[in-house]
C-alpha cells in the first residue's frame, strides 16, 4: 500500500508487440466512488469494471475512503486513492486534499499514458485532472451527473439565495465541461437541462445502462415471493418499494404520506440516510408505522431479490438525471409510479409500464399505486412492459458507446495535434 501521492507501485503500461491490438487505456477521474453511496459513484464503478471486463486498461483516481492515500486493484481496475478529509456536509462523502493533487495527477498521466481521460464530476478531482490532461494533449470526455438542487440541502444554502447559488454553480460546471472534447449525460432531459443553462457545446445522451442478467423478474409465483420476503424480513403484503438514500432530495416523505392513504399497501425502504429517524417519526404521525419497513443498507448480493419482493416501484425525487434504481426496478419487471419531473418521464410510458403523478401530491401517488396493485393482470402486464423498456438500456450498449467515444476523442486529439489545432471554449 502506497502512503504517498506518487503511487510508485503503478508502472507505465507496456508497449504492444508489432502487429498486436493495443488495449484501450482510460483514466477515470471522480470525486465520489464506492464505498460512497450515490448514483454517480455507482455508475462510475460499473463503468470502470465493465470496461475492464471488456479488455480495457482502466485506472480510477478518486478520494480515499480512509483518509490516507493508497493504490489498489479491484475487479480489474487500478484505484489511485488520494489523501482525503471529511466533506462535513455528508458523512458518506470525503474530499481530496488539494495540496499536492496536481503534481500527483501529472505523474499519473505520464505513467498511465491514457488514450482518454473521463471525468465524472467538475469538482476538485475532475477539474484538476481535466486541466492536467489538456496540458499533455490527452483528450477529455466529461459526463455530467450534477444538479445544484442535489447539493443545497447538504450545504445548507438558505432558500432566498438558492437561485443565485444555482446560477453560479451552473456557470462553474459549464466552464469545466466546455473544455472537454466530448460531453455526455444520462438522458435527453439531462442534455436539454445543460442547454437551458447556457451550455452551447454538443451534449450526447448515453444511458447509465443496466445489467439485465443481474436484475431480472421473479422466476416463480406467490410462493417464491413469500420465501424471498421471509428471508429478507419483509412482511407478506402488497408492497411498494423504494431503493436509495433516505435524504431530503429524494422526497421519501412523500412516499410515506402516500402509503398511509392506501388500503393496506406497505412501503419498503432499502437504504440509509440522514432522514431515516425523521421518516420513522413521520410514519408514526400518519398512522403507517406498521406499514413502513426500513431495511437499511442492503448487501450487494441481496439487492436483486429486494426488487423481486415488490409489487410496484415508486420514486418521488424531482432532481433525477436518470435514476439507476428505477432502471433496476424496470429490469426486475416492476411497474413504475414516478414523479412527473426532470428525467423520470423518460422511464414511464403512461398506462403502459406505469404512471406519472404530480410532484407534491401524495394523494395522486397513492391512487396510482392502488390502481396498479388492485388488478394483478394489469400489474403483470405493466411489469412486462417495464422489462421491455429496460432492454433499451443494456449496460453492454453503454459500455460499447463509451469505448467508441474514447477512440474518437483520441483520434481527434491526434489529428488536432498534428495540425496544430486549438479547441474553442464555451
What are these regions (language model features)?
Residues 109, 176-177, 297-298, 305-310:
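Short alpha-helical donor nucleotide-sugar binding micro-motif in glycosyltransferases
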Residues 1-83, 407, 423-426:
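N-terminal subdomain of nucleotide-sugar transferases
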Residues 62, 163-223, 234-235:
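Donor nucleotide-sugar binding/catalytic pocket of nucleotide-sugar-dependent glycosyltransferases
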Residues 371, 378-392:
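A short, well-ordered alpha-helix in the C-terminal region of glycosyltransferases
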Residues 350-351, 355-362, 371-377:
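Conserved acidic donor-binding segment of nucleotide-sugar-dependent glycosyltransferases
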Residues 318:
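Aromatic "clamp/platform" in nucleotide-sugar-dependent glycosyltransferases that forms part
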Residues 335-339, 348:
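Short hydrophobic beta-strand element within catalytic cores of glycosyltransferases
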Residues 42, 238-261, 274-280, 363:
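A conserved mid-protein helix/loop that constitutes part of the nucleotide-sugar donor-binding site
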Amino acid at each position: 500500500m502506497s502512503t504517498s501521492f506518487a503511487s510508485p507501485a503503478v508502472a507505465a503500461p507496456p508497449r504492444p508487440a508489432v502487429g498486436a491490438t493495443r488495449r484501450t487505456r482510460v483514466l477515470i477521474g471522480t470525486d465520489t466512488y464506492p464505498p460512497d453511496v450515490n448514483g454517480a459513484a455507482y455508475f462510475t464503478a460499473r463503468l470502470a469494471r465493465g470496461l475492464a471486463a471488456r479488455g480495457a486498461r482502466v485506472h480510477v483516481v478518486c478520494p480515499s475512503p480512509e483518509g490516507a492515500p493508497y493504490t489498489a486493484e479491484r475487479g480489474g481496475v487500478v484505484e489511485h486513492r488520494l489523501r482525503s478529509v471529511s466533506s462535513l456536509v455528508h458523512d458518506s462523502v470525503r474530499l481530496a486534499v488539494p495540496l499536492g493533487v496536481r503534481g500527483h495527477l501529472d505523474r499519473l498521466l505520464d505513467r498511465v499514458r491514457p488514450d482518454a481521460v473521463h471525468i465524472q464530476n467538475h469538482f476538485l478531482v475532475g477539474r484538476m485532472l481535466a486541466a492536467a490532461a489538456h496540458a499533455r494533449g490527452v483528450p477529455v470526455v466529461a459526463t455530467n451527473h450534477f444538479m445544484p438542487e442535489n447539493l443545497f440541502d447538504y450545504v445548507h444554502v438558505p432558500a432566498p439565495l438558492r437561485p443565485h447559488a444555482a446560477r453560479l454553480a451552473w456557470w462553474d460546471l459549464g466552464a469545466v465541461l466546455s473544455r472537454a472534447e466530448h460531453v455526455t449525460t444520462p438522458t435527453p432531459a439531462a442534455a436539454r437541462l445543460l442547454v437551458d443553462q447556457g451550455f452551447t457545446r454538443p451534449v450526447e445522451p448515453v444511458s447509465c445502462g443496466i445489467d439485465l442478467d443481474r436484475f431480472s423478474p421473479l422466476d416463480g409465483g406467490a410462493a417464491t415471493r413469500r420465501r424471498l420476503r421471509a428471508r429478507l424480513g419483509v412482511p407478506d403484503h402488497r408492497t411498494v418499494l423504494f431503493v436509495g438514500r433516505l435524504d431530503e432530495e429524494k422526497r421519501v416523505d412523500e412516499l410515506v404520506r402516500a402509503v398511509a392513504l392506501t388500503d393496506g399497501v406497505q412501503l419498503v425502504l432499502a437504504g440509509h440516510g440522514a432522514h431515516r429517524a425523521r421518516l420513522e417519526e413521520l410514519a408514526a404521525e400518519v398512522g403507517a408505522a406498521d406499514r413502513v419497513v426500513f431495511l437499511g443498507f442492503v448487501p450487494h448480493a441481496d439487492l436483486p431479490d429486494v426488487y423481486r419482493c415488490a409489487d410496484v416501484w415508486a420514486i418521488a425525487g424531482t432532481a433525477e438525471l436518470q435514476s439507476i434504481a428505477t432502471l433496476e426496478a424496470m429490469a426486475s419487471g416492476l411497474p413504475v409510479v414516478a414523479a412527473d419531473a426532470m428525467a423520470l418521464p423518460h422511464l414511464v410510458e403512461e398506462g403502459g409500464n406505469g404512471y406519472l403523478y404530480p410532484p407534491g401530491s401524495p394523494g395522486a401517488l397513492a391512487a396510482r399505486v392502488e390502481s396498479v396493485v388492485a388488478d394483478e393482470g394489469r400489474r403483470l402486464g405493466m411489469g412486462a412492459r417495464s422489462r421491455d423498456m429496460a432492454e433499451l438500456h443494456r449496460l453492454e450498449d453503454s459500455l460499447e458507446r463509451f469505448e467508441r467515444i474514447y477512440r474518437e476523442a483520441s483520434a481527434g486529439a491526434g489529428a488536432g495535434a498534428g495540425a496544430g489545432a486549438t479547441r474553442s471554449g464555451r
